[in-house]
Regions:
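Ligand-binding loop in jelly-roll beta-barrel domains
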Residues: 88-117
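Short, conserved beta-strand element in jelly-roll/cupin
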Residues: 37-41, 52-68, 109-113
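Short acidic-glycine-tyrosine-enriched beta hairpin
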Residues: 72-89
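Conserved short histidine dyad/triad with adjacent acidic residue
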Residues: 19-21, 36-52, 87, 91
């Protein structure tokens, strides 16, 4: 059990991407859905622009001050109370940034747990993230290899 007014936050990020995240569904014992409460300080982005291959995501703006960069690439205000869905694939690309003067909060709800399996594409930096319970790895997409590279056929 957890409470949105007193969740266990983890501090994440680097300059420009500082954020606090509480994985409230996980803290409450959920195993197949992800719900996180995010707190984004002024001038910081919650995360890089990205889209998911497996998980669909919904964001609920709890405060004013957030701006959304969607799949079209343009920034727009995300007013308090707005609920927006991000489908899987490039059309679900998104990034949230706090352009306000005070900390802004939002909820994210995903079709998979926050520590679940997903593949995430980061087009701005050319990375691909592979995530599961045991794997949290990011790779540059430019280093893709041929399907058969390194494979040896069985010998009799």
């Amino acid at each position: 059990m957890t409470n949105l007014n007193e969740p266990d936050f983890e501090d994440r990020g680097v300059d420009g991407f500082r954020v606090r995240r509480a994985r409230v569904a996980q803290q409450a014992g959920a195993r197949k859905i992800g719900v996180s409460l995010w707190e984004v300080p002024p001038g910081e982005a919650a995360y890089p622009y990205h889209w998911h291959v497996i998980d669909e995501e919904v964001v609920v703006a709890l405060d004013d001050g957030l701006s959304l960069r969607g799949a079209a690439g343009e920034w727009r205000p995300l007013p308090e109370g707005e609920v927006i869905a991000f489908p899987v694939g490039a059309e679900g690309g998104h990034q949230l940034w706090n352009r306000g003067e005070s900390t802004a909060r939002f909820l994210s709800i995903s079709s998979g747990p926050s520590e679940g399996e997903d593949i995430v594409i980061y087009p701005d930096s050319g990375k691909i993230g592979v995530y599961s319970e045991d794997v949290y790895e990011l790779y540059p997409r430019e280093r893709a290899v041929d399907y058969w590279e390194g494979e040896t056929p069985p010998s009799p």
